[in-house]
């Protein structure tokens, strides 16, 4: 996407197909913001969501610009695996990076309007109503301790002298004069872990030098106008202003981003089986093609998995059984256990720069 404005100020409202971004878009119109509307297309949304985006665009009376990425499926094929809970690269590659690329092409001061609410998750409860978009390029989004793993190992009741911790133990002895057989070892490690030289700051880094140069001339701020709203307030606001939310909510889905998400609940899987069985079949084929499973190990109880492997626990040295569930296994389990009835809560992506919904 090339430059779309050279005006001094440029408001952007992110539209995902979900209720919160829809309410934010309506709020912008009612408050005379007149933003450019952007939809980051992962090419993994449901057809109902794509239809919703098209209809919402007509109702808004303003174009919704589609930002394209490599797409979820092509990204997974390229990496030869699906995203996972520990390697959740999907949001960054499919939404955050295309958005940053787009921002850096603009010659304007930008204000981004995000549909994020405090009650959605613990992570979002800590967000501010107004912020700087590139904040976590210049201050850490989290700080960890160099010896966190040793402390966790001790807290779990295991001896810290594991292969994973060997280098850390040597560092403790050399730099901090702490040995594993010292009295009050845990207390000493905890104190050492809080020393400035043992604190590790984590920053976002994608195109950092380009961002630094861009920020010499322009700014990029974030506004979250509905951050304090409840879910009822969101739906009521949409309907009271003459709009209808994404039809997937009527079908029982609570989140309507990637369809399905690798972090979706078993209730959500049941809904996909019911409404989009062809998507389930497609994922089965992708699993075979990539020799990778869509869901993580132990997503369902091990005894229900067709593939079970032995894994040596790094902390105890003991071997344990870990189930690797195929989509076929998950479907059988979900149907056998009666998932999908009643309300359920979706999972939440944690990226600070761009919400999944």
Q: What name fits each language-model region?
A:
Residues 1-357:
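Nucleotide-activated chemistry modules centered on ATP-dependent adenylation/adenylyltransferase
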């Amino acid at each position: 996407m090339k430059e779309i404005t050279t005006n001094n100020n440029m408001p952007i409202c992110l539209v995902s197909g979900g209720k919160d971004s829809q309410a934010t878009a309506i709020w912008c119109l009612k408050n005379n913001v007149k933003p450019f509307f952007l939809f980051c297309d992962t090419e993994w949304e449901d057809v109902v969501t794509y239809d919703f985006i098209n209809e919402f665009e007509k109702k808004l009376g303003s174009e919704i610009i589609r930002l394209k990425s490599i797409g979820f499926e092509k990204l997974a094929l390229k990496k030869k695996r699906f995203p996972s809970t520990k390697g959740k690269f999907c949001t960054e590659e499919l939404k955050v990076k295309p958005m940053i690329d787009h921002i850096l092409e603009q010659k304007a001061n930008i204000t981004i309007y995000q549909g994020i609410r405090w009650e959605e998750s613990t992570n979002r409860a800590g967000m501010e109503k107004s912020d700087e978009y590139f904040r976590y390029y210049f201050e850490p989004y989290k700080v960890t301790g160099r010896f966190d793993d040793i402390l966790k190992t001790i807290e779990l009741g295991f001896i810290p002298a594991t292969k994973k911790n060997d280098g850390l133990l040597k560092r403790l002895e050399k730099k901090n004069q702490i040995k594993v057989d010292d009295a009050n070892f845990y207390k000493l490690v905890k104190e050492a872990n809080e020393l400035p030289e043992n604190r590790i700051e984590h920053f976002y880094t994608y195109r950092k030098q380009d961002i630094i140069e861009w920020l010499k001339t322009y700014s990029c701020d974030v506004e979250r106008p509905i951050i304090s709203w409840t879910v009822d307030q969101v739906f009521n606001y949409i309907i009271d202003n003459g709009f209808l939310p994404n039809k997937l909510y009527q079908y029982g889905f609570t989140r309507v981003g990637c369809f399905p998400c690798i972090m979706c609940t078993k209730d959500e899987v049941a809904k996909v089986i019911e409404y989009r069985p062809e998507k389930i079949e497609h994922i089965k084929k992708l699993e075979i093609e990539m020799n990778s499973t869509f869901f993580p190990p132990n997503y369902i109880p091990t005894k229900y998995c067709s593939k079970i492997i032995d894994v040596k626990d790094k902390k105890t040295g003991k071997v344990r059984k870990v189930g690797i569930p195929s989509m076929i296994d998950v479907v059988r389990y979900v149907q056998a256990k009666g998932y999908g009835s009643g309300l359920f809560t979706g999972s939440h992506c944690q990226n600070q720069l761009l919400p999944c919904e």
